[in-house]
Amino acid sequence: MQGLNHTSVSEFILVGFSAFPHLQLMLFLLFLLMYLFTLLGNLLIMATVWSERSLHMPMYLFLCALSITEILYTVAIIPRMLADLLSTQRSIAFLACASQMFFSFSFGFTHSFLLTVMGYDRYVAICHPLRYNVLMSLRGCTCRVGCSWAGGLVMGMVVTSAIFHLAFCGHKEIHHFFCHVPPLLKLACGDDVLVVAKGVGLVCITALLGCFLLILLSYAFIVAAILKIPSAEGRNKAFSTCASHLTVVVVHYGFASVIYLKPKGPQSPEGDTLMGITYTVLTPFLSPIIFSLRNKELKVAMKKTCFTKLFPQNC
């Protein structure tokens, strides 16, 4: 991130939830519990997949990669937010702000790319089951995970470089709880702010929409294949293998659409801050719950793993 323009401003101030002083302790406790649950839930999923040989398959390799991404995404944002809820000193250095934006966008886009890869995995499993082991080999799956991570890092670098090459002329208050693009654009000055804003918005929407359309295409083929299965039991079994992934996709893109496709007009900073909770705290919190409850195979394995750790003498 060399060449970033920080000659005018050396630090920013994260306003966060300062508009709700009487709620800050309650918000701290709530977000802390959700954060810990997110970490523990994803770590439990990873430990279960690692310890259960029956789960050593591409579907759960992608799930582990997704869990790692969610842990890193929340670590990039929530600890700083929790610290600010208990502090009156909310300044953040220029480079620290740039780093937070880079990591949050990188892991956020990696999450979207991995969901797309998981959609393709379900498509191959249901529409081409006889070719599954060939199309979803270990090498191929590792390559897809690596490409998802590389794509996320590139997106994070592109967005962060574009924003932090702008000039920030004196104003330092970011009306959000982390270094996000829209509130930072409001602090920027110069003739190129509008061009950068449109360019960054176009890149983000194109990437997210492209991932969503690919997932939609995968499920169009999946639904067509499921409808051809003669027995109701067979159709239910096929659909159950996709239920958890499909639910997470709906949650992920549902909240993303609220943020990126909201109508233009006057927006209160407090409203934008509260809306930011949906994709920084709520979505990562719900994801391990959905996967552990909607995926029967994973749920049974997680119960077995927990029972083994708690009562090893009975195993």
Curated annotation (Swiss-Prot):
Extracellular side: 1-25, 76-99, 161-197, 260-272
GO MF terms held by the record: G protein-coupled receptor activity; olfactory receptor activity
Cytoplasmic topological intervals: 47-54, 121-139, 219-238, 294-315
InterPro entries named among the record's database cross-references: GPCR_Rhodpsn, GPCR_Rhodpsn_7TM, Olfact_rcpt
Superkingdom classification of source: Eukaryota
Listed GO biological process terms: detection of chemical stimulus involved in sensory perception of smell
Membrane topology according to the record: Multi-pass membrane protein
Summary of the function given for this chain in its UniProt record: Odorant receptor.
Family: Belongs to the G-protein coupled receptor 1 family.
Protein name as catalogued: Olfactory receptor 10H5
